[in-house]
């Protein structure tokens, strides 16, 4: 089974203090380091020198281990409580705010792409999800293309040109972008 589970937190350290876990191992050109966000919450052999699993996370997956990514998302620091979160998440964002470069630069995941945002004008969750996918190397050839062209192949899974985002990740990120737009607008 291949699964990719990401869970967002305002402060991942809080959950990691509560959950028994072993940081995932990442190897690159023979160099070992702890994975930035991935942990195993089940027993897995430990490398005490590097303080992470003794099996690379990709190999561990083939052996049936399950890595979970606990991600820090500072956007959640702007949320006051559950009711506020529900309200901000349910609200349709003012997508036109993204046309203002200083505003767009503050928005999570897309702040470095203000010119492309202005050109392509993502104005819905599906379009924002596709936009997030095409700023990854594997789908960069779809930048500045009409939305019809983008949607014809953005979710085809072809990663021959580089790293691609899965549709589920892109939609989740798009929802976070929408939430962040609403939270930033509320602060103005």
Which ranges hold each PLM region?
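Mg2+-dependent phosphoryl-transfer active-site scaffold
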Residues: 1-187
């Amino acid at each position: 089974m291949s699964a990719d589970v990401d869970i967002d937190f305002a402060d991942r350290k809080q959950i990691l203090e509560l959950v028994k876990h072993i940081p995932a191992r990442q190897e690159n050109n023979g160099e070992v380091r702890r994975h930035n966000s991935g942990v195993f919450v089940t027993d897995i052999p430990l490398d005490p020198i590097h303080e992470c699993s003794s099996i690379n996370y990709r190999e561990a997956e083939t052996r049936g281990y399950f890595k979970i990514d606990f991600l820090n998302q500072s956007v959640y620091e702007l949320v006051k409580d559950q009711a506020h979160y529900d309200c901000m998440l349910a609200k349709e964002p003012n997508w036109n705010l993204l046309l203002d470069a200083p505003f767009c630069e503050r928005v999570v995941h897309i702040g470095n792409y203000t010119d492309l945002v202005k050109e392509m004008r993502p104005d819905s969750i599906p379009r924002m999800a596709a936009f997030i996918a095409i700023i990854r190397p594997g789908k960069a050839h779809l930048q500045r293309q009409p939305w019809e062209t983008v949607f014809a192949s953005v979710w085809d899974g072809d990663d021959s040109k580089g790293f691609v985002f899965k549709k589920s990740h892109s939609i989740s990120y798009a929802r976070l972008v929408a939430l962040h737009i609403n939270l930033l607008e509320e602060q103005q």
